[in-house]
Amino acid sequence: MEYTVQWLSDNTRIKELVNFFISHKTTSYISHSEIISGRAVDSKHWNSNLEAILTDQFNNENNTSTQLKILIAENNNHDIIGMLVFHVINSGFRQYAVLEDMLLDQSIRGMSIGSTLLKNAIQESKNWDIHFILLESGVDNEGAHHFFNKYGFEKVSENYILML
C-alpha cells in the first residue's frame, strides 16, 4: 500500500481527524490523559461529547507555551489511515513533547505505517530541539506497550486514579 506522511499544516481537516479518531478508538486506549482532558469519563468509558471535545482540542492554538502538532498518514485517495497527535511543551526548563494519541485504521495494521509515523515524529523532535518524548498508554493496551518499547521508550512510572 502506498501512503504519504505529513504534518497537518492547517485546520481544514480537523473534522476528518475527529471522525477518524472516533472510528478507531477502543477502551483499551483510555489512560489518565484521556480522563484529564475530558475525552473519557473514566478508565472504561469515552465521553458522550467526544466529538466536540476533540474538535476543540485539535483547533486550540491559543497557548504560547505549548504547540499541538498532528502527523497524518493518508492513502492515494487522501483518506486518513493513521494519525499521531504530538504536544510540544516549553516548560521554561527544557522543551519536551507528549505523544498524546496515535491511531491507525485497523485494516492496515502490520504495514509499518505506525512505525513510519513514530520515526518521523522522533526525527522532527530532534530537529525541534526537544529533549525527550513522554507518552502514556492504557493499562490493557499491551500491543502499544510492546510497540513503544521496541523504539526505546522506557516505563518510568505507573499512574493511579480514584474516581470521586
Each language-model region and where it sits:
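Conserved N-terminal entry element of GNAT/NAT acetyltransferase domains
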Residues: 1-37
